[in-house]
Design a protein with these regions (language model features):
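Transmembrane alpha-helical segments
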Residues: 259-267, 307-319, 348-356, 445-452, ...
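Membrane-interface micro-motifs in multi-pass membrane enzymes
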Residues: 221-225, 246-258, 278, 285-309, ...
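Contiguous transmembrane helix-bundle modules in multi-pass membrane proteins
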Residues: 342, 463-474, 479-480, 489-615, ...
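Membrane-interface coil-to-helix junctions
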Residues: 162-263, 284-305, 394-398, 407-432, ...
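Membrane-embedded helix bundles of polyisoprenyl
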Residues: 161, 253-270, 275-360, 371-396, ...
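Active-site-proximal, structured, solvent-exposed surfaces of multi-pass membrane proteins
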Residues: 146-147, 772-1015
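Periplasmic/ER-lumenal interhelical loops and adjacent helix-loop junctions
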Residues: 185, 190, 196-198, 231, ...
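Extracytoplasmic/lumenal acceptor-recognition loop(s) of multi-pass membrane glycoenzymes
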Residues: 585-606, 621-690, 726-727, 731-757, ...
């Protein structure tokens, strides 16, 4: 008996056994608490989960601290408090994993609650063990004050940008200080609405795979992968929807500050001295460069900006010591996870770095190649659960069609060098693709020559970096190279998105130059200074630059040159003082320029766009009862994706993941479309019926052009109803499979859709009234009365306009027009001299109104500057044939899909089919959908590759649609394999290191400090 007791005691001495016992008891506390709360209270799954986890955390701390990871030494109160704070912090991270993971399995994978909870408990158990063992109860853990002392430079490099951003918040009245925001351009029109939908899914336990709130129905995983994959984004659950813009500004500010810290870490490693005071200005310059000031509203890009220094630090560690690849793998994984688009540019940069790295000999080169390729593939595999679905999705977009541009230059290279100088305004958006953000401090320019002439820096390192900055500068100015850097994609108004790589190299070179200065380098320093001043003289003569910039650069060059020379000559405490003064001067320039940059960028006043959000939401709620299988829209949006912001099941979508086939189909139905967008603008009775748009909300100061019935006014917002909104699916003729959206005339395309689906012809009839042109700026010609095109010539330079007017000649007309022209900005429409509308109308259908004979209609076209001469404008005029539309609607409405269950990524309903044919649905086609008819899986058909359709036989049928993101299964397999390989490699490395340390361990190593002192 005693033998068994001794065995049990020995077994209990093993830490892993104790952890399994304590972990099992903690899991029991968690599970029992969770299911009791779910059974006896009305708490939501997430709320019950959080309470259960908090109870488990309290139990687990004492179990782990005093039973599992027990120490022979008596713990001080301070250590207990520190351990408790660390433990709770780590467990809170695990709580996020558990809550999100449970909801993901329940709502996205549709697993049972109990099964989901058990699966996640296993994952959390592993995470908690690693954190407790390696961080919380680590026996040789450093005191906090020692950690702070060892890393004070990195901390300062974080604090300075953080303080700058806080002051910016106060001065620019951002967030709680005045309602302004850093979310501008696409961040306002795309990201904020997408974050709203993401927020809704996280808070209300929705699917993270699919959403009906974006573009009629979209793959949410694709959108998360492109815009919102950063783990830090989970903080949005702490904010209400109306304060999400504040959460986004917080994220931007945190990432900017972290960029300073990571750059400081890299520079400290680069020159093997992490406590050099001069690191600070270079790190802050990276965090507050013009690239960051201009483009930080792309908050998902900032993850890659902040992780780049760690990727490069890990890369260089790996090249020096082949076994040291953990930092590289994990940091590259983080970059790929957070934003694969910008990380693609980093990967191209890494390949160039690797090619230009000195591998010493062919054997080392082969070994480095295998290691670099292997760890890079491993990092990609670890993030494959997002990368593979995202790659499949991006290949359905317009950008998947690659048209390589010619080898051409945007302009003079000196125009780009000009962007490196102080007081250069950062670019936040620009149509010219040759624009670039390069400024990161005048001292960075000065140090280029000093770096080149520094004899302490290895020649091949200098050659590598010079080649890289020259190649990058070429790429900024070259159409083909630019296209490749941007992922074989056009830039669309945000030029040279990879210029942060140039800034990174420039600052790295600059710091390496100044960190390796001594008296022997004075000749090289002098030559470098001469080169810098020579560049400035040339720039003054050959570049159109403001005199203030030239003078200020002269002054800064002189001051920095003097400071560097004094730094070289002085030793001891004097050198530290000079370094401190020089750092302060550099920081002053950077902070001043950043302040001017943000002043130039401006901010967005959120109340201008969402000031009436409560009223709009009240109107939406007046007709919305939970999830419903019909669509709603806003009459005139203030931001492009505004319907998504309100979590409406709308039509519009402006985003980088939009399907090209869907864009083309929406164009064919009369909507406004762009390269990566389709909007509700252009809706007409046919498209509104087919897509099931039942309600429209109109702010009372807006013009209403859509033909719908007024229902009510709720808090100043008018509610309109489309009585002919069809259900999600309905029967049509098989001929609709042959419909294409490529007709040159939208009215013809719509007529074709109606005729193929119902057999009814002539829904829209094009008319040709006598049109009169008028303009003081343009000569207008119209030779053929049956042509919808009007010649434009003799165009006056500058902003111009012209008008086309006509009279109604029939008794009754339900009039629609299409008005467009290259270079157009807005169109103004008058009916009998009274302005009806003035907005951005492009190639889309527009409802002028129900007009009677003799009514005059005038359409004015307004252009931006630079309209090409000898171009043409288009005015297509048509009337809606009410009888034909009524007949078509009756044909569609006869056999509709009645919905029984409607969730994100899941639809179930029944339909009675009078005659075998095609069931058209307004569900956007995605290969992730699977269809079932009467319980049997069936092939999905498509209409124009854009909408899902099913072949159905006569009779009653139960229809079911299930969604699972394409590529996710294989992605999860690769991710599991990648992490497994990484864990095995790390474990093997740890075992090897322990064995090595034991072999070299002296016999008396186990003695205490007191014993050693006695001897």
């Amino acid at each position: 008996m005693n033998e068994y007791v001794d065995k049990i005691k020995k077994l209990m001495e093993k830490e892993m056994v104790r952890y399994v016992i304590a972990g099992g008891m903690t899991t029991a506390v968690n599970l029992v608490s969770f299911f009791v709360l779910r059974l006896v209270t009305d708490l939501s799954r997430s709320a019950a989960n959080i309470i259960a986890i908090m109870l488990a955390i309290l139990f687990a701390y004492f179990a782990n601290g005093f039973y599992v990871f027990r120490s022979e030494q008596r713990k001080s109160v301070g250590r207990i408090i520190r351990e408790f704070i660390s433990f709770v912090g780590m467990r809170l991270f695990a709580m996020v994993v558990e809550v999100v993971g449970t909801n993901l399995l329940c709502d996205s994978f549709r697993y049972n609650e109990f099964i989901s909870k058990i699966i996640i408990q296993v994952v959390v158990l592993v995470i908690n063990y690693i954190f407790s063992k390696c961080f919380v109860f680590k026996k040789d853990k450093k005191p906090v004050k020692d950690i702070l002392a060892d890393n004070y430079i990195m901390i300062i490099a974080f604090i300075i940008p953080a303080i700058f951003m806080f002051v910016l918040w106060v001065v620019a009245e951002i967030g709680p200080f005045g309602g302004h925001s850093l979310t501008m351009v696409d961040s306002l029109h795309q990201y904020l609405p997408f974050f709203s939908d993401y927020h809704d899914k996280l808070v209300n336990e929705g699917s993270l795979f699919y959403t009906w709130d974006i573009g009629m129905g979209s793959n949410l995983l694709d959108i998360i992968a492109y815009y919102m994959a950063c783990p830090l984004n989970f903080i949005i659950v702490l904010f209400s929807r109306e304060h999400l813009y504040i959460a986004m500004c917080v994220l931007i500010s945190i990432k900017i500050a972290l960029s300073g810290m990571t750059m400081a870490s890299y520079l400290g490693y680069k020159c093997r001295n992490k406590n050099n005071l001069l690191i600070i200005p270079f790190a802050v310059a990276y965090a507050l460069s013009n690239y960051v000031i201009g483009y930080s509203w792309n908050l998902m890009w900032m993850d890659c900006i902040l992780i780049l220094p760690l990727i490069m630090q890990g890369f260089e560690q790996m090249m020096e010591d082949g076994s040291n690849y953990r930092l590289y793998t994990l940091s590259l994984f983080y970059g790929l996870l957070c934003n694969y688009y910008i990380c693609f540019m980093i990967c191209v940069f890494l390949v160039l770095q690797f090619i230009l790295t000195n591998h010493k000999n062919i054997y080392k080169g082969a070994e480095d190649t295998l290691r670099f390729a292997g760890t890079s593939v491993m990092a990609a595999a670890m993030s494959a659960f997002l990368l593979i679905p995202a790659y499949i999705g991006i290949n359905t977009t317009a950008s998947a069609t690659r048209h390589f541009p010619k080898w051409e230059w945007y302009g003079s290279i000196w125009d780009m060098i000009k962007q490196m100088f102080v007081l250069t305004e950062p670019i936040k958006s620009q149509q010219f693709d040759g624009g670039v953000n390069l400024y990161c401090g005048t001292f960075a320019i000065l140090l280029i020559g000093i770096y080149i002439f520094n004899t302490k820096i290895k020649w091949y390192e200098k050659l590598k970096n010079v080649i890289l900055i020259v190649f990058l500068m070429m790429s900024f100015n070259n159409t083909l190279l630019n296209y490749i850097w941007h992922g074989f994609h056009d830039q669309y108004g945000i030029p040279n998105r990879f210029s942060f790589l140039f800034i990174f190299i420039l600052l790295s070179m600059g710091y390496e130059a100044i960190a390796n200065t001594d008296k022997k380098q004075i000749p090289g320093i002098a030559l470098g200074i001469i080169v810098a001043f020579g560049l400035l003289v040339y720039a003054d003569k050959n570049i159109d630059m403001d005199r203030t910039v030239i003078i200020l650069t002269w002054v800064l060059f002189a001051v920095y040159s003097a400071g560097i020379l004094v730094l070289v000559l002085v030793r001891g405490k004097g050198r530290f003082a000079v370094a401190a003064i020089l750092s302060v001067l550099c920081l002053t320039e950077i902070v001043f320029s950043a302040a001017k940059g943000y002043e130039s960028n401006g901010t967005v006043n959120i109340p201008d766009y969402y000031g009436d959000a409560a009223s709009v939401q009240a109107a939406i709620d007046s007709v919305k009862t939970g999830h419903f299988p019909y669509r709603t829209e806003l009459n005139n949006t203030k931001v492009v994706d505004e319907s998504t912001y309100y979590n409406m099941q709308g039509v519009s979508l402006f985003g980088s993941t939009v399907s090209n086939d869907l864009v083309n189909a929406m164009h064919g139905l009369g909507f406004y479309t762009g390269a990566n967008e389709f909007l509700f603008d252009g809706a007409n009775p046919v498209s509104s019926s087919v897509l099931g748009i039942r309600y429209l909300f109109r702010r009372q100061d807006e013009h209403m052009s859509y033909d719908m019935d007024y229902v009510d006014t709720v808090d100043g917002v008018d509610v309109y109803q489309n009585s002919r909104a069809l259900k999600l699916g309905f029967m049509v003729n098989n001929e609709l499979k042959d419909w294409t959206s490529d007709a040159s005339n939208m009215f013809d395309s719509i007529n074709n859709f109606v005729e193929k689906s119902t057999g009814v012809a002539g829904t829209f009839s094009q008319i040709y009234p006598e049109v009169t042109g008028s303009s003081n700026d343009i000569t207008i010609t119209h030779d053929n009365p049956y042509s919808e095109y009007f010649g434009l010539s003799d165009i006056t330079p500058g902003i111009v306009s012209f008008g086309l007017s006509f009279d109604i000649t029939e008794e009754q007309n339900d009039l629609y027009i299409i008005a467009n022209c290259n270079g157009i900005t807005k169109i103004r429409i008058y009916v009998n001299g009274e302005e009806q509308n003035y907005e951005r109308l492009q190639y889309q259908t527009y409802h002028v109104g129900h007009l009677i004979k003799g009514t005059n209609v005038e359409v004015e076209y307004y252009f931006s500057a630079g309209v090409p001469d000898n171009t043409s404008a288009r005015l297509t005029i048509a009337t809606l044939n009410g009888a034909a539309f009524d007949q078509a609607y009756e044909g569609w409405a006869d056999n509709q899909l009645n919905i029984n269950k409607f969730e994100d990524g899941y639809v179930k309903g029944h339909i009675s089919v009078d005659e075998a044919g095609l069931m058209f649905t307004s569900i956007p086609y995605d290969s992730g959908w699977t269809a079932y008819v009467d319980g049997r899986k069936t092939d999905i058909q498509t209409v124009a590759g854009a909408f899902i359709a099913l072949d159905l036989e006569k009779g009653d049928h139960v229809i079911e649609f299930k969604y699972f993101p394409r590529g996710l299964k294989s992605g999860l397999i690769f991710t599991f394999a990648g992490w497994l390989v990484f864990a095995l490699l790390m474990n093997a490395k740890t075992i090897k290191e322990k064995r090595g340390s034991k072999k070299g361990k002296p016999e008396d190593e186990d003695r205490t400090d007191d014993e050693a002192a006695i001897e």
